[in-house]
Design a protein with these regions (language model features):
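Hydrophobic transmembrane alpha-helical segments of multi-pass transport and channel proteins
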Residues: 51, 89-93, 97, 227-232, ...
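Helix-loop-helix junctions within the multi-pass membrane cores of secondary transporters/permeases
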Residues: 259-342, 396-397, 403-407
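Transmembrane alpha-helical segments and their short flanking loops
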Residues: 111, 312-407
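Signature of multi-pass transmembrane helix bundles
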Residues: 3-7, 13-17, 24-28, 32, ...
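Membrane-interface alpha-helices at helix entry/exit sites of multi-pass transporters
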Residues: 76-83, 187-194, 284-299, 328-330, ...
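Short amphipathic alpha-helical coupling elements at transmembrane boundaries
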Residues: 39-50, 79, 135, 143, ...
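Transmembrane helix boundary and interhelical junction motifs in multipass membrane proteins
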Residues: 56-60, 196-199, 269-277, 291, ...
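Membrane-water interface of transmembrane alpha-helices in multipass transporters/channels
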Residues: 36-40, 78, 213-221, 248-258, ...
Length: 407
């Protein structure tokens, strides 16, 4: 049994793809002929989604509080940390903005129709900018959690996080409790994720049965557009940053960082690529160890530019496909929440899935979109991790040029 468990963990990505393919085939050829198949997969899919959503709000709260606390303690590392944080936050905000505007301009998902049940969680209401401001502070945090108001949960998380930094040592006991709760949330989600192949199968069957082959075509098109956005952002934004701020040839930069970028693409892990990233920028681009030793690990934690693009594209794609209107005020809200979630849930198992679930809830998308997203999450994650790592190394080059490093 232990041997099977280890084998399954090692091959879970392949199992997810197998679940996706079987789900598509079942939805196309069996679900409309055998009602019991559609009934059973719909029920099991709902159970899987409920288990996943069960920990989304606690995880968002804990991870953001811990993220803010870690950033606060990192101030002791000095001006390199501050400059790196500024660079990463600016590029993440730019990535989120691009991810929301471009899909709206090209009408991403328009013409695609996903027939899904509406979400059980109340969507965040955004009638005006004034209403947005008025609804920022939760009068009852428990009600915010219970009612699924992600905006108020995010603000409450910020308040707790910055307050814990302000009170210093007196906040350490509570911080340890939140850290423990964060680990519990991660453990529960990682356990649920072991059932992802079954969950993907069960959630994709009703979608394909209702929408036919258009589901496959639309998702394939979405992946192509997403990858164009990923690497277009890397070439334009990071290329301009290393040229203008880093005084380095973009051609030289991209050639030098290629080994680390390819490793990140294959492993889907920014953290696992840290040693190779440091080697590339130090040996090939002349970045000092002092800069790379701070910027690369920090970037692996907080620099989630491609995740911001991914989340924004997916929200707009599913909104158009499910005929959910995203207003201008809602776009602003999703933009701000996207930046916060990208920094607050870094490099954790299921982190991107948790971020998407939070944003999908905020936008009022049907619960069924989660199953569709999870089915292609690995393919998305490969490109996203690659671009994030490129951004980490671009930050190193910029900081090396812009900051006076004391001997």
């Amino acid at each position: 049994m232990k041997g099977f468990y280890q084998w399954y963990r090692k091959h879970i990505t392949g199992a997810i793809f197998a679940g996706l393919i079987l789900g598509i085939l079942t939805g196309l050829f069996l679900a409309d002929k055998f009602e019991v198949v559609l009934t059973a997969t719909s029920a099991l899919g709902s159970i899987y989604m409920n288990a996943l959503n069960m920990m989304i709000f606690p995880l968002v709260f804990c991870s953001i509080v811990m993220g803010i606390a870690s950033i606060g303690s990192a101030k002791t590392t000095g001006k390199i940390t501050g400059a790196a944080m500024l660079f990463f936050l600016c590029t993440t905000a730019l990535a989120s903005f691009m991810g929301l505007i471009i899909p709206r301009l090209i009408h991403l998902g328009r013409g695609v129709k996903f027939e899904m049940a509406t979400s059980d969680i109340q969507a965040t209401k955004m009638d005006s900018i004034l209403d947005t401001v008025k609804s920022l502070i939760p009068s009852n945090p428990v009600k915010a959690f219970a009612g699924g108001n992600m905006l108020q949960v995010l603000v409450f998380s910020l308040v707790i996080g910055f307050t814990l930094i302000a009170i210093g040592e007196k906040g350490e006991p509570l911080l340890k409790v939140i850290d423990s709760l964060n680990e519990v949330c991660l453990k529960i989600i990682s356990t649920v994720m072991y059932f992802t192949p079954i969950g993907v199968f069960c959630t994709i069957v009703p979608v394909v049965e209702a929408n036919g082959t258009s589901t496959i075509v639309s998702l394939a098109t979405q992946l192509v557009i997403l990858y164009i956005a990923f690497f277009g952002f890397a070439l334009v934004v990071y290329g301009a940053a290393v040229k203008v701020l880093g005084k380095t040839s973009p051609i030289r930069f991209f050639r030098a960082i290629m080994p680390a970028a390819l490793n990140a693409f294959g492993t889907c892990s920014s953290s696992a690529t840290i040693p190779l990233s440091k080697q590339c920028v130090e040996d090939e681009l002349g970045v000092s160890n002092q800069v790379s030793s701070i910027t690369i690990p920090l970037g692996a934690t907080v620099n989630m530019d491609a995740v911001s693009i991914l989340m924004s594209f997916m929200i707009m794609f599913f909104a158009n496909a499910c005929n959910v209107n995203i207003s201008i005020s809602m776009m602003v809200l999703v933009l701000l929440a996207n930046v916060l979630l990208s920094v607050g849930t870094p490099g954790i198992p299921g982190g991107a899935i948790a971020s998407f679930a939070a944003l999908a809830t905020m936008a009022g998308l049907p619960a069924g979109v989660m199953g569709v997203y999870i089915s292609i999450n690995t393919l998305c994650d490969m490109g996203a991790t690659c671009v994030n790592v490129i951004g980490d190394m671009a930050g190193c080059v910029v900081l090396q040029e812009q900051i006076d490093i004391e001997a």
